[in-house]
Structures are given as structure tokens and as C-alpha cells.
Amino acid sequence: MIKAKIAAALLAGTMLAGTAAQAADMPGEGVTVRPVVQAYAEEYFQARILFRALEDLGYTVAEPEEVVAQTAHLALRTGDADFFTAHWNSLHNTFFEESGGDEVLERVGTLLSGALQGYLVDKSAYDAGVQNLGDLSDPAKAAMFDADGDGSADLAGCVPGWGCERVIEHQLTEFGLRDTVTHNQGEYNAIIADTIAREANGENVLYYTWTPYWVSGVLVPGENVEFLAVPYTSLPDGGTANTEFEGKNLGFAVDSIQVLATDEFLEANPAAAKLFEVASININDVSIQNKKIADGEDTSADIDRHVDEWIEANRAAYDGWLEAARAAAE
């Protein structure tokens, strides 16, 4: 009888130890997290890397809501989502403040650093003297980029709600370009596909883009296109930022992309908070993956495979994120 009691006690102790170990490995067990994302395949890669890490910590990741960046920020403010993986620190600052700012939200870590935006033209136009956005105040130079015959330069621009449209609209007025430049907005992939086709046909092109994104793997800065400078730094609402990159003023902040989460979620989930703090992905890895999407590997299964491949190639760093997150939950 005594031996039986001892055995039962040992078994109970082993079970408790196992339960404790499981809880330590899976601090998110029983918690469902609600991400919000933009509806663009090119942003799903880095988001799903974080989703996978959250799942490895025991969290259940709900199907993400797909909205534009401005609405994503508001979704956090209203409590309809817990976190957003594509907050540009400078570009989206207005959205951040409009959604409650530091009182309800927190920017966590730096998921991607060195993100760029800017205006570009084809190499032949650049070599012919169009090297600054301000040059387009000259009607003759602006006409070089007239795609529809109205005499105005056609700028392949930014989708409303992304944030970049505010900068472009501000600068067109600031630099006196309203009479010579038309900001074409709509579905970006359609607009840029037309731009790429026209450049391939030897036509002059003027467009906005950003990195990380696959476009710069097709229209390659320094090869077949060049970034334009701007006359001086001027951002909406009197904003200030470093807009210089490699000696050229691009007009947009040299930015970092962070996870944005609600204070309430971070306080309740220290493991997730630490994960967001330490997770970091090389921006070139995202550009490489985005090029795969552009080349046809664009299904959800393809993106999941890209995530698998990235995790295996970066296993030590990825496991380090999980270890730090688990330690934070103890």
C-alpha cells in the first residue's frame, strides 16, 4: 500500500511537471489573437512568419481582417483587432495619432529596417536631365511623361488610404506641380504593370514605389531607372524626418516597419509582446520573396512554403525569438 501511494505521488508529480513544462513552452495556449493586414500578397510573407511564431508559442491566430493601412490603425483603436504587422513608423504616424496614439497603442520592435519610398523615372529621361521632381514644373519636361496626350506628366502613384498619397498630394502642391503633373491613383499592381510595359517599349515613365517590393527587381534603380531627388524636404502637417538616402533627398522618410499593437493586448500577453520586440527580418529577404510572387508563386500555399523556407534558413534566429518570448512569460 505504501509503495502504491509513493508511485501515485511520483506519477502526479511527473504529470504536474509535464503540465508546467508544456505551459512554459506554450504560453499562448488558449488565447486567440486577431491580426489585421493589408490585402496585398506582398505583405503576407513577413506577417505569416510572425503568425507562425505565435502559433509555436501556443496562440491561435484568427483569420486576419484585410483592410488598407488607415483602416488597420482604426481597427486597433476600436478594439476590433489586436495587432498590425506593417506599421511604417514615419509614413503612418498620422494614422497612429488619429487612432489614439500612445494612450492606446504601442509600436513594438523593428520588424524591417531601411524601407524606402520615392519617385523614379526611366534611365534615358534621367540622363536627359530630369533628375529632380521639381524639374517637372517645366511643361516641356513634364510632356516627356505624358501617356494620355493631355500634355501633363502621368505619375503612377499611391492608393488612397496607404499614407503615401498624402505625401505625394502635399508635394505636388508644395513644389508647384499641379499644372504639369497628374497623380494617377487606383489599383497599384495594374498601374505599375502598365508602367513596366511602357518602359519595356522604350517609353518614358514616372512612378512612385517603395522597398521592400518586387517592382525594384524589374525596374532596377541604377540600371534601367533612377530615383529622383526633390527640391527640399517637405512633409504633410509640417512633419520632419530623415529623407536622405545615399546623398539624395528622396522626399520620403527613410523608414522602419514595426508591429503596432494595443496596450491592452501587450499587457495581457507578455510572450507575444516580447516576440514583437525581438523579431527582425532582413528587408532584402522580403524583396526576394516578393519577386517570387511577381514571377507566379503567388498562391497562399506558395507563401506558406516561402515562410517554411525562410524559417529553416534562419532557424537559429527564429528559435531565439521563441526562447525570448517564453522567458518573458515566466
Q: Where does each model-flagged region fall?
A:
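Immediate post-signal peptide segment of exported/extracytoplasmic ligand-binding proteins
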Residues: 21-34, 143-152, 318-330
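Short, well-ordered beta-strand elements
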Residues: 28-42, 59-65, 152-156, 276
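Short helix-initiation/N-cap motifs at beta->coil->alpha
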Residues: 40-41, 59-74, 183-194, 212
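Pocket-flanking alpha-helical
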Residues: 47, 64-103, 194, 214-220
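Ligand-binding pocket segment of bilobal, Venus flytrap-like solute-binding proteins
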Residues: 81-85, 159-234
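A conserved helix-loop-strand patch within extracytoplasmic ligand-binding domains
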Residues: 104-157
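A bilobed periplasmic-binding-protein/Venus flytrap-type ligand-binding module shared by bacterial periplasmic
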Residues: 117-127, 241, 256-268, 291-292
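C-terminal functional modules
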Residues: 252, 265-266, 273-274, 278-330
